[in-house]
Amino acid sequence: MKKIEAIIKPFKMEDVKEALSEIGVEGMTVSEVKGFGRQKGHTEIYRGSEYTEDFLPKIKSEVVLADGQVEAAAAAIVKAAKTGKIGDGKVFISPVEEAVRIRTEETGEKAV
């Protein structure tokens, strides 16, 4: 099993959700996060005053999948989230040793 974490632009979340649904991914966890990378925040003017916002709003989407689904899911996320502009985000893939479905106590791939 692997966990895919994707940090994406908020307005791309629905596209990513639909893309994952189309390949059979049935669930995910989504969090509102803030961060910066090469984009390095942005400057705004509010009521005549200029200020810098270092951390930009992003969405963090997490899914845990069987190894056989990971490549297709990562590709679907990239395709759906990509705008071609700076700040599109990142996808991280890491191993998951175990999963337990609390309600049924199923373990491993049966739990995801």
What are these regions (language model features)?
Residues 1-112:
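Positively charged, small/polar-rich N-terminal and surface patches that mediate targeting and assembly
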